[in-house]
Regions:
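Positively charged
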Residues: 2-115, 142, 146, 153-156, ...
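Amphipathic alpha-helical segments within well-ordered protein domains
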Residues: 134, 145-148
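Small/polar glycine-rich anion-binding or flexible loop at a beta-alpha turn
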Residues: 123-126, 148-153
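Core structural elements
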Residues: 121-139
Length: 178
């Protein structure tokens, strides 16, 4: 994806991220229909590799894929179904509404060896926090896609709760049933 980042840095510093669907090895996988447009906010070249920070701006639907000779894929996209992403309306959820989710996420992240600065997260906007945790989580690509496609923060919160419930019935205590 080095060429994609190079091309982006020459223009608007934006890239679209789309998850591939599970496909057969050695084939070009089909893409999920919903992705997210992100803006590169930090860029470092490290020995031919890039370390970037990407700020998610707006979800989109794929209209069709554009054929090209580039080592990355391009698509015609549409933002119409995600106009609410552009509105900065305050959601009714509060951090206190998420205490159980945070507790379960902390347990899962610890179990998987993830290190998260929770105090820093609690200083961020709630929407940014939920989105960052959803994408940084050890959830499967399909589970992350479900979260991406969730219509709003309340639905995303409920989906995270449902996904967490599938990981371990006993609160991530490694209990085995035979």
């Amino acid at each position: 994806y080095v060429e994609m980042i190079n091309d982006s840095m020459k223009t608007n510093k934006m890239v679209g991220l789309i998850q591939p669907k599970n496909g057969k090895k050695n084939s070009v996988p089909s893409l999920h229909g919903v992705g997210c447009l992100g803006k590169i906010t930090s860029f470092k070249n490290m020995d031919g590799r890039y370390l970037i920070d990407l700020n998610g701006l707006n979800r989109f639907n794929i209209i069709n894929e554009i054929k090209n000779n580039k080592p990355y894929r391009e698509c015609e996209i549409n933002f119409d179904n995600f106009q609410a992403d552009l509105k900065f309306a305050k959601e009714e959820l509060k951090f206190s509404d998420l205490e159980l989710i945070f507790k379960n996420l902390k347990s899962l992240f610890k179990k998987k060896g993830y290190i998260i600065n929770w105090k820093s997260l609690e200083k961020q906007d709630l929407n940014e926090t939920i989105n960052a945790l959803a994408m940084a989580s050890p959830f499967s690509l399909e589970e992350k896609q479900i979260l991406l496609e969730s219509e709003n923060l309340e639905i995303r919160k409920n989906k995270i709760t449902e996904i967490l419930a599938t990981y371990d019935y006993d609160g991530f205590n490694n209990t085995t049933i035979q």
